[in-house]
Amino acid sequence: MQQHPDQLKLEEEPYLKGTVNTVIYHNDTNLYTVLKVKVTETSEAIEDKAVSVTGYFPALQEEETYTFYGKIVTHPKFGLQFQAEHFKKEIPTTKEGIIQYLSSDLFEGIGKKTAEEIVKKLGDSAINKILADASVLYDVPRLSKKKADTLAGALQRHQGLEQIMISLNQFGFGPQLSMKIYQAYESETLEKIQENPYQLVKDVEGIGFGKADELGSRMGLSGNHPERVKAAILYTLETTCLSEGHTYIETEQLIIDTQSLLNQSAREGQRITEMDAANAIIALGENKDIVIEDGRCYFPSLFYAEQNVAKRVKHIASQTEYENQFPESEFLLALGELEERMDVQYAPSQKEAIQKALSSPMLLLTGGPGTGKTTVIRGIVELYGELHGVSLDPSAYKKDEAFPIVLAAPTGRAAKRMSESTGLPAVTIHRLLGWNGAEGFTHTEDQPIEGKLLIIDEASMLDIWLANHLFKAIPDHIQIIIVGDEDQLPSVGPGQVLRDLLASQVIPTVRLTDIYRQAEGSSIVELAHQMKNGLLPNNLTAPTKDRSFIRCGGSQIKEVVEKVVANALKKGYTAKDIQVLAPMYRGKAGINELNVMLQDILNPPKEKRRELKFGDVVYRTGDKILQLVNQPENNVFNGDIGEITSIFYAKENTEKEDMAVVSFDGNEMTFTKKDFNQFTHAYCCSIHKSQGSEFPIVVLPVVKGYYRMLRRNLLYTAITRAKKFLILCGEEEALEWGVKNNDATVRQTSLKNRLSVQVEEMDAELEALQKELPFSVHDANIGMEGITPFDFMKEEQQ
């Protein structure tokens, strides 16, 4: 009998057959599994009777027999292991084995007695008979037709998994990604892929256009196949919006970019024409995969996020109940008493900001460093309590009684700064909205947030997705104050919410321009405002009491930074006080190399200092680390800085995994070693990651090797992180070039224009579009609930 080619391939692979004694570990999310297997047969030189088998599997059953295909590896701590790429379930052939198999947790509703009846009726070949014809079960006592069909279907799925995994492996998918694909499609996996391999991009996290296109090519799909062109358009739209911060792309530009992508590797001379791309865009629009409006193409989540934010902002801003709420004489009297009590003298623009904040439904407060934004926020809070006769002591309120003033910011560190400056509780926006993981946000339009006054700080970091969720959850009766510096870097995610709100001129706005910290002798603030205008001081290299410039070339940066940090340590500063910032990761002056050097200075190895190696990186207790992945459910966000407080080795815990405990300002999280890619060292970090934070000492290398990244708003953001001291090191020419370079990408957004449209017109437009769509526009993130910018971006995995 001729063997199937796949079977020949399997027999050539190293294998291990055995019974699963124990499932040591199984991750329900990524399916990573560690098993202890009693070996009955193997192609390898394995002397142990029981071996650890690792791989990505569904929930395998203890006491069941499987054949694993892969290779022997030696783990540095756990010794010899069999690393499985795929596996197959051995069909039991004895009556006892079949009864145990059918009555296992794999088959819901089949108990031992029913399994015994099946074996009694069908004999030792029961499983093969059921796989061949499900109707053989219909005459089995104790088994209804519905249960019989369910059992037969489950058997087909479990037995089919073996062939599916083999095929996916041949398609070039690794075991982890193969399991993700199987989870998405189950028994229909191969049919779905054959039907349209590009559907994988939409349905399976971790598969990008490149991987799907490689598969499409292997399957013989033509270069101008409609599904390929549509997938390329979605990929281009997604990656451009995420990398450039746009909420849309002009249709003409989208066609050009798609042609450029696909024609780089045209198949068999099949080039994509403008008409091919245009037809695909029309088809995507008709299928509601994108929204086309006035020559612009949007993802639905971005289109409706902008629509909803504009509608809510205009509605809230139109409230009139706060006008003339307090007579001017009463306001001025209370303000004067506040100035005396707090020993502060408010400037005219600051008084205007406080008065508008208390008499408007919404206020935008903007200004650069040192202009008194924090002073104004503190004044608003104090005067609100005074004029409304409410206590500002959180302990005076009962557990179920809402505190009237709500303070929030996009990141944990920004919220902490807000709390420190006001003396009141402050939270992240995700915490305010009640993020609860996969279920999304607790607070929505149906269950709005509580309070009377809401102040949002660091609003330049607010992207359109989060802004949409925020404004949906704000009830009409809450006054809103939005604070931020429009000259800082925009949000990581799409949109430019603060800039668009300011440009729309539909919301009362106060711009603080007078610099107060400069009067206190802060040359850092003076430098920031000069940079904002494209200028540098004549005395740039002359040392001041809070700023210095050290000339050096790119090859000398590590040595200079090392000396600066060592000197700061001698003066009593700690790793928490010192922050090195750089715009690039690679190179001698890059973040990666600087972190290695800084760790050796700030947290060197010691005899009792525990450490773990992850790839080429060593982590130690006491290390300063930077979170890279949003985990709103744990109140930890991309950009948060923490400290490794404990390290536990695998032999010391029941999970049998190396672990690190990280404290983010008292909020502790435990990471298993395989999740160490969620953070990195924070002795040196990117300027983007530092946004929303302040540090006593900032060390900023600026060299010509950074030229691709040097821009005015980047440098402006970097130097405004320094609270007490700023040490610039590098080349004057590089700094001058960066300050003159104001060519930051102009984000393409529609929020400003939508804010100028009347609410009635917007309602009519939304209603017309809703009739064409298969879902409710009130859920702006259909299919993407709770998604962050990083969740939205799919990266290819092997």
Curated annotation (Swiss-Prot):
Effect of loss of the gene: Replication forks collapse more frequently. A modest (2.8- to 3.6-fold) increase in spontaneous mutation; the mutations observed are not consistent with a mismatch repair defect. Increased sensitivity to mitomycin C (blocks replication by adding bulky N2 adducts), single- and double-stranded breaks generated by phleomycin, alkylating agent methyl methane sulfonate (MMS) and UV damage. Increased sensitivity to MMS. Increased sensitivity to H2O2. RecD2 is synthetically lethal with recG and with ruvAB. RecA threads persist for a longer time after induction of DNA damage.
Keywords: ATP-binding, Cytoplasm, DNA-binding, Helicase, Hydrolase, Isomerase, Nucleotide-binding
Binding residue positions for ATP: G370, T371, G372, K373, T374
Gene3D superfamilies linked to this entry: 1.10.10.2220, 2.30.30.940, P-loop containing nucleotide triphosphate hydrolases (3.40.50.300)
Record-listed E.C. numbers: 5.6.2.3
SMART domains for the chain: AAA
Enzymatic reactions: Couples ATP hydrolysis with the unwinding of duplex DNA at the replication fork by translocating in the 5'-3' direction. This creates two antiparallel DNA single strands (ssDNA). The leading ssDNA polymer is the template for DNA polymerase III holoenzyme which synthesizes a continuous strand; ATP + H2O = ADP + phosphate + H(+)
Induction: Approximately 25 monomers per cell during exponential growth (at protein level).
Subcellular location: Cytoplasm, Nucleoid
Cross-referenced InterPro entries: AAA+_ATPase (IPR003593), Coronavir_polyprotein_1ab (IPR050534), P-loop_NTPase (IPR027417), RecD2 (IPR006345), RecD2-like_HHH (IPR029493), RecD2_N_OB (IPR055446), RecD2_SH13 (IPR041451), UvrD-like_helicase_C (IPR027785)
Gene Ontology molecular function: any one: single-stranded DNA helicase activity
GO terms under cellular component: cytoplasm; exodeoxyribonuclease V complex; nucleoid
Further comment: There are no RecB or RecC proteins in this organism. In B.anthracis it is involved in mismatch repair, in D.radiodurans it is involved in resistance to oxidative damage.
UniProt record similarity statement: Belongs to the RecD family. RecD2 subfamily.
Matches recorded under NCBIfam families: recD_rel (TIGR01448)
Subunit-structure text: Interacts with SSB (sbbA).
Protein function: In vivo may favor replication restart by preventing RecA from binding to blocked replication forks, avoiding unnecessary recombination during replication restart. Acts as a negative modulator of the RecA-ssDNA filament, may dissasemble RecA threads, can act as both a positive and negative regulator of strand exchange. Probably stabilizes or aids normal replication fork progression, is important for survival after treatment with DNA-damaging agents that can result in replication fork stress. Overcomes the inhibition of replication restart by RecA/RecO, probably by displacing RecA.
Protein name per Swiss-Prot or TrEMBL: ATP-dependent RecD2 DNA helicase
Organism: Bacillus subtilis (strain 168)
Gene: recD2
